[in-house]
Amino acid sequence: RTAGDYLQALSRGDEAAVQLMHECRDLIATGDTGNTSAWIADDLRLIEMRRKVTNILTHDTLPDKGMTMEYNVVSTDTTGVTKQAKEGDALKFGKVTFGTKSVSIDTYGGYTTMSRQVIERSTTPMLNTALAALRNAYAKATETAVRDYLYTTIAGQRDATSNPNKLDAPATLANMTIDNWATLIMDAAELADDRNVNLTRLGVSKDVMASLIDLKDSGSRFFDLSGDGSDTIGDFDLTGIAGKFLRLPVQMLPKAPAGTACFIDPESVTVWESGGPTQLSDGDPTKLTENYSVYGYMAVAATNVDGLIPVKFKAA
């Protein structure tokens, strides 16, 4: 059965459809929970496919209750291990102290109104089209919220007036050479090793990606754009907005502020979400209409800012 078939059955008060509505609303926490209704899995997969930035971060499930949630962070870590000088000597002492932070849980959703005539007498594809539009709008809204949070956090870390978290580039973006980039990546790898985080990918704004693609050696482009072969230092999929640079995955961050470049460990930012975003509200018997809504709950927070290593280019 399709989503349109489900909506028609739900409008008739079909017991199985009503039960499925409650299961969708309360129990589904991921896209793979063994649910036997194929269209539900398809809905969640379509939502994930349209969230390019959200998908590079860590995901977790929201708690059952609460308008805000707390999460633990490491405040200080003085632990260390050294060689014991001689038998019986005290080992090196250290301790970890923890703190808590809180983040608000926000609601994202929208609805559409359809007449009972459309629900009961139209062909299923017409209903599916309306539902698909809501799914896509939900994906766009939640993806935009995650992008805004990530981009703001990167800029805040890089441009902080006190103890900024950044790597200083040796040149302006326009003047960065392949050697400059290679050194920058090595510096980032060394810093990531010190912080015990992963150098998973380099996230960049559109202008930075264009600058990377424009790198040349005696007129020959460094990047393979055709996909027909491997070039010297990397390749880039112009439609998938992702590629590799010196074996490091590169992801374009759509609509990020100009000059944005940041090495990103997925565990640096966590996205908490509720279950499958589907719910049918009550109809209006005086107008013979039904309101179909899509909604979900989401929270976003920086759970390990050490996993973000922003790049600061020299001013032009």
Residue ranges and their predicted role:
Residues T129, D217-R221, L308-P310:
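Short, solvent-exposed amphipathic alpha-helical segments in soluble enzyme
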Residues R1-N35, A316:
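Intrinsically disordered, low-complexity terminal tails
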Residues Q19-G110:
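Assembly/oligomerization interface modules of large self-assembling protein complexes
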Residues G110-L191, K314-A316:
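Alpha-helical scaffold segments that mediate packing/assembly in large oligomeric complexes
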Residues T79-Q84, K95, R121-T123, S211-I213, ...:
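Short helix/loop capping segments that flank catalytic or ligand/cofactor-binding pockets
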Residues Y111-T113, R201-G203, N291-S293:
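Structured core elements
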